[in-house]
Amino acid sequence: MSDNTPTPQKNPDTNPYASLISQQIAIIPSFTLESGVTLNNVPVAYKTWGKLNEKADNCLVICHALTGSADVEDWWGPLLGLNKAFDPTRFFIFCGNVIGSPYGTISSVTTNPETGKPFGPEMPGSSVKDDVRLHYIILKSLGVRSVAAVVGGSMGGMTVLEYPLNTPPGFVRAIIPLATSARHSAWCISWGEAQRQSIYSDPDYKDGYYYEIEEEGGKVDLARQPARGLAAARMAALLTYRSRDSFESRFGRRAGGGKSSVPKGGVRIMGGQETTDPSVPSESDLAAKSPSWRAWREHNDGHRSAGARPISRSGSEGPAHREGDAAQAEVVKTQDVKANGNKIGTGGEAPPKIFSAQSYLRYQGDKFTGRFDANCYIHITRKLDTHDLSAPSRDTSLSSLSSGLPSSPDATEEELNARLIHALSLEPPALVIGIESDGLFTTSEQRELAAGIPDAELVVIPSPDGHDGFLLEFEAINGWVEGWLKRKMPEFYERRVINPEEYVQGEEGFGIKKESVFGEAEADVTRW
């Protein structure tokens, strides 16, 4: 047994994000990143289903996307179960959390053993190759001799492509990348930059040191973060995950209100708009406000940090300024500007109309800040930017195909393309799946993968949901993945490793049974 053998974590991390998941966490004594930085006592979160067969070669590795976790049941639940693509009675299923994610593996919210405080912005950058090498250590400790197939979409698809190149030759038998690319495009890099700038522009970001509260003597509070910036970044990301047609069909120009906290029981039927929400202004409240006040409120609708209205250009103080911050806090609440009529101009008394699409984005942004960390978001989007399958691994401790890829700092575009073609030629048999309406990882990028991998099949799934189709088109994806595995690996379908009668079956069918915590799938995308 080597000195670097993972050991179970004895004292669970107090990280509130990791506590959202029932999973296992192992500690790796030492791990060196592609950058050359060595990390000590590295926590790695993972989850498994099923069990290994006698040959220990029936492992299915599932790789999560940017904001996902090791809990496959949460974001790909309809694909996991008896007689489904990810069948625990036939396969030993493993999913590891990536470096930089707040859900258990080492990240910005992990306590730095040298300082006793979270790594924060001082967490060293990582690559997709690092994730593969880290998870390989865990797989070997679990007794896995070889992997039947690696499956994943988006960032998870990048991990899938790197697996055969960053583990010993022959360790991975087949791969199934979905909605991904061989190298991160300029389009995706630009969207990632825009999202990071949203976080940086939040005054609460504090260069990433927002965990420490100065007025409380440097006390660490992981719940403290630049929530407005992170919410804005999430909103921008959601627009890249869906398609124009998807938003138009679901929302159109319909009014929307969103979830709000209001007392149960009672309805106002006189003195103002009929409502069950006590925060909605009455007729007298609205009448007391000046036209300039109403214009100010409409202009700042959705601005989460709007305080008291400043003094006007004329030097006078509007009614809002005199009434103080409490009154202003009221007018910027989402529930205060629910569908209260059709007046949008500043001259009317009705609050500004909020479109359903706006309300959806605001709700999703707020929801995201409760389950993800801003520094972690920055870390992982930068990880995505570094993705290039043709880049050789700097690690020489493990004999892998990636470490043998040609490298030249002054390579021309033609040489870079040749390196990519060479890297793809080293991949094992593959089922490449794309989403027809995906504007983030286009079908042309899926064609590039399939054309470069020697034994590859390409499937394009029609879906109006854009990139998120890989998380929503469960039935189609299940059918193609299971069918391909049966053709390529019939031996795993000749006998089971777990008696079906002993397996606790979850929900049947391919519909979304519950709202996902870590994925994009919603039981009803218009419910919020």
Curated annotation (Swiss-Prot):
Residues 295-304 have a biased composition (Basic and acidic residues). Inhibited by 6-carbamoyl-3a,4,5,9b-tetrahydro-3H-cyclopenta[ c]quinoline-4-carboxylic acid (CTCQC). It is found in: Cytoplasm. Keywords: Acyltransferase, Amino-acid biosynthesis, Cytoplasm, Methionine biosynthesis, Transferase. Its main location: cytoplasm. Disruption phenotype: Methionine auxotrophy. Attenuates virulence in a murine inhalation model of infection. GO terms for biological process: 'de novo' L-methionine biosynthetic process; homoserine metabolic process. GO terms for molecular function: homoserine O-acetyltransferase activity. Its EC number is 2.3.1.31. It is an enzyme of class 2 (transferase). The keyword Transferase applies. The active site is at S154 (nucleophile), D438, H467. SUPFAM superfamilies: alpha/beta-Hydrolases. It holds the Pfam family Abhydrolase_1. Residues 389-409 have a biased composition (Low complexity). Residues 250-335, 388-413 are annotated as: Disordered. Pathway: Amino-acid biosynthesis; L-methionine biosynthesis via de novo pathway; O-acetyl-L-homoserine from L-homoserine: step 1/1. It catalyses: L-homoserine + acetyl-CoA = O-acetyl-L-homoserine + CoA. Residues 273-282 have a biased composition (Polar residues). Disulfide bonds: none annotated. Residues 60-245 form the AB hydrolase-1 domain. One of its GO terms (cellular component) is cytoplasm. Belongs to the AB hydrolase superfamily. MetX family. HAMAP family: MetX_acyltransf. Commits homoserine to the methionine biosynthesis pathway by catalyzing its O-acetylation. This is Homoserine O-acetyltransferase. It comes from Cryptococcus neoformans var. grubii serotype A (strain H99 / ATCC 208821 / CBS 10515 / FGSC 9487).
